[in-house]
Amino acid sequence: MKRTLMIVIGSLASLLLINPVSAENPQQVQQLLNTRECPGCDLRGADLRGAHLIGADLRKANLQGANLEEANLEGADLTDANLEGANLTAAFLTNASLNQADLDGVNFTSAVIYDADVTGASMERINLTNAQIYGTGIAVGGENP
């Protein structure tokens, strides 16, 4: 009996290691992709690479650690969203609202950020390598005065 129990426990443990638990809510990811409306959604760690999220409502959404590489977020409302540690490599953020957003540790490598509103956003440890930034309050050392 003990041997069988140990085999079952060992099998379950190996399954957990093979299929890591994902933090995002799959229904909310689908809701976002289908409707572009997901205010307050839990999208932590979501894989949204290449997603077309033009004009998306992501106010107060939790996108901590999400992969938004090459995502189109033109005109998206990310007011008060948590993007800490998110990957926005080569993302397109023209006219996006990032008011009061947590952008700490975000990777903006090669991102296009034109006329985005970052009023009150937290921007510590962001990576702006090769990013194209125009008309936006992001500069070396933080927000422009």
Task: State where each predicted segment sits.
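Tandem repeat scaffolds
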Residues: K2, S22-P145
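Cleavable N-terminal signal peptides
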Residues: G10-S11, V21
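Bacterial N-terminal signal peptides that target proteins for export
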Residues: M1-I7
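Short helix-onset patch at the extreme N-terminus, typifying the N->h transition
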Residues: I7-I9, P145
